Regions:
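Juxtamembrane intracellular "pre-TM" segments in multi-pass secondary transporters
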Residues: 1-2, 180-210
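Short amphipathic helix-loop junctions that connect adjacent transmembrane helices
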Residues: 26-38, 225-240
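Helix-breaking motifs and short loop linkers at transmembrane-helix boundaries and internal kinks
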Residues: 35, 67, 88-93, 236, ...
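Residue-level signature of mid-helix packing/kink "hotspots" within the transmembrane helices
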Residues: 49-57, 141-142, 250-258, 343-344
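Structural signature of the two symmetry-related core transmembrane helices
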Residues: 70-84, 165, 271-285
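Paired small-residue
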Residues: 93-101, 294-302
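Cytoplasmic helix-loop-helix junction between adjacent transmembrane helices
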Residues: 98-137
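Intracellular juxtamembrane helix-capping segments at the cytosolic ends
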Residues: 108-121, 309-323
Length: 390
């Protein structure tokens, strides 16, 4: 295990997720001030997910062929330039273009960094190392919105954008200086090119993890998009109270990543995925029946626990598959595509159900999707341990 490389990747990903957390909650307000309607605000968020999803397969496979460092440094530098572009944006169309470019940059960073960590992770420590690495994501997403709001209130929204640029620049410099040159970064040297996506797509274990990741992040998108509306409409909660609730789930899941990753290396990974998935489904279902702030408080903790149990096991299995297929970047890209598609589809499908029926049915729909995907994932991953040890 190369501690310098791991620490550099950890800090770089923390910096970029912190930067995202600094500005994303502020984007709807800024877009509205530029004259965006509700539809264009949807385009602003959709452009990011669309470009990220489109470019993930390309950069994932290319990083298997060309190395990780060039993509990490390019993506982080692009984030810095995007932050400057936010400040200079004067109309909605340019704002949408910026978000599209940011999605492309995002496709170069997280899956490539996760693939790099997967490559340097010792056997039988996949859960612990990926769980520890995931702390960088959850920490950035937990701290970012709080700091971003404080910076905006004190210095204005442009300062929040520039803060994103600063932390992205720090991440870029860390990777540029401390990651080894491309020629020396491959700690596992495959003796053949990475598998093509059409071959990886036929791997039932990848399909199972993709399906679970899609369902789980669709539930995240549902909760993040509609919990504020539900909490305000049903219980008249303040914006600060709603912010605490949303952050609570992220924080809980983040705190569980490392200990549950440790368990994933020692116990049945499929069982942990099933338990975490069912806890997540139960939490989403409970939102319909809770009463008041404290009911939502408990439901959000439960939602975070579900992710905290399941995600390290999912990532551990992903690393094992990537190592076995000698296509770590491509496999990570596929799983991240599931994440992106879930975050894109979850709020949209929930919105359709809310408009056609009522808000509570959106949470019911998320519950059903999660339970079905847990069952299918369990079926498809049968025999995984024997396959992994061949």
């Amino acid at each position: 295990m190369n501690k310098k490389v791991f620490s550099t990747l950890f800090l770089a990903v923390f910096s970029v997720t912190l930067g995202v957390g600094l500005v994303v909650p502020l984007l709807p307000v800024y877009a509205y001030e530029l004259g965006a309607t509700g539809l264009y605000i949807g385009f602003i968020f959709g452009a990011f997910s669309l470009s990220r999803t489109l470019f993930l397969p390309y950069f994932g496979r290319l990083s298997d062929l060309k190395g990780r460092k060039p993509f990490l440094t390019t993506g982080l530098l692009a984030y810095f330039l995007v932050s400057i572009a936010y400040v200079l944006s004067k109309n909605v169309s340019f704002f949408i273009l910026i978000r599209f470019v940011q999605g492309v940059a995002s496709a170069m960073i997280l899956p490539v960094a996760q693939a790099y960590v997967g490559e340097i992770t010792p056997k039988h420590k996949e859960g612990f190392m990926m769980g520890l690495f995931n702390v960088s994501l959850y920490a950035g997403l937990s701290i970012g919105p709080l700091v971003g709001g404080m910076v905006k209130d004190s210095f204005g929204i442009h300062s929040s954008f520039l803060s994103m640029g600063l932390v992205s620049l720090i991440g870029f410099l860390l990777c540029l200086i401390f990651l080894p040159p491309r020629a020396h970064e491959r700690f596992i040297k495959p003796d053949k090119p990475p598998l093509r996506y059409r071959i990886l797509a036929r791997n039932r274990y990848i399909g199972a993890l993709f399906m679970f990741r899609f369902a789980y992040t669709a539930c995240i998108g549902l909760v993040w998009a509609f919990l504020p509306l539900f909490a305000h409409a049903q219980f008249k909660l303040s914006s600060s109270a709603i912010g605490v609730l949303v952050m609570l789930g992220v924080l809980t899941s983040g705190l569980l990543q490392t200990p549950m990753g440790f368990l994933a290396d020692r116990f049945n990974k499929r069982a942990l995925i099933a338990i975490g998935g069912l806890v997540t489904a139960g939490a989403v279902f409970s939102f319909i029946h809770v009463q008041g702030f404290w009911g939502l408080f408990v439901a959000n903790i439960l939602f975070g626990v579900g992710g905290g149990i399941s995600v390290p096991a999912v990532m551990a299995m992903t690393v094992i598959i990537g190592r076995r297929t000698e296509s770590m970047g491509s496999v990570m890209a596929i799983l991240t595509m599931g994440h992106s598609l879930g975050m894109f589809a979850g709020p949209i499908l929930a919105g359709i159900m809310t408009d056609a029926f009522q808000l509570s049915l959106a949470f019911m729909g998320g519950t059903v999707v999660m339970v079905i995907c847990v069952a299918v994932a369990l079926l498809l991953t049968s025999g995984f341990q024997a396959w992994a040890e061949v």
